[in-house]
């Protein structure tokens, strides 16, 4: 019974995928480059718009009890927000499109020989996504820690840390080099190593975009992933929680968490912001 249902699901998805490609075309470069950039852009701004509306209207009222770092950046400073949005848009267009083009021609084009029209099995998709998560954690953790050292922090990563109590829409507010090294490479290179199918890549980019918005939203909803308070804690303390999922932070002793009252552990409180 389960096998029949799975086969029916795969057949349905394959049919819809073929129809989609019949409409938009099945040229790999166009799909990997512009399809990926457009997917990220749509998910980012739709979800960010909802969360930004919550930030400005403070409605629905029940969400306020899930606010992390209450009283900070509340209300949102629009004078800081508007320039930040320009940076976000720059990163998502003038940085992202050439980067996606380069990644396709130097990574995906040679690493991936899969038939773009033939969807992978459910088992293969789940396995590839799980492996990508492990690789993403490794690449992001060590890359992120590197960005906290000396000149790399001062001239590149510090820009992102201007928001010690961030909101969702500034998730991509960062130096262009950081957008390449931290926001894109951990995901894109993981997919290249795994040699994932385009659809698996889109699923992974969609999940990653949702996660980065949730991680910077400033709200720990009941349905939020554990990474939400985890990454918010990083913005509040600077020197803890460098990873995506916390696995390597626990290994290297850089893991931190808010106490039951929502306060930063005393020994983790920064004396001053890094310069």
Regions found by a protein language model. Name each.
Residues 38-48, 89-104, 131, 182-189:
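Hydrophobic alpha-helical transmembrane segments of multi-pass integral membrane proteins
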Residues 120-141, 145, 201-214:
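Membrane-embedded alpha-helical segments that form the functional core of polytopic membrane enzymes
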Residues 2-38, 94-125:
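Long, highly hydrophobic alpha-helical transmembrane signal-anchor segments
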Residues 34-38, 85, 126, 130, ...:
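Hydrophobic alpha-helical transmembrane segments
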Residues 41, 55-109:
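N-terminal helical submodule of small eukaryotic multi-pass membrane proteins
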Residues 1-26, 30-34, 53-63, 67-76, ...:
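Cytosolic/stromal cytosol-facing helical appendages immediately following the last transmembrane segment
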Residues 76-97, 117-137, 171-172:
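Alpha-helical membrane-spanning segments of integral membrane proteins, especially the hydrophobic core
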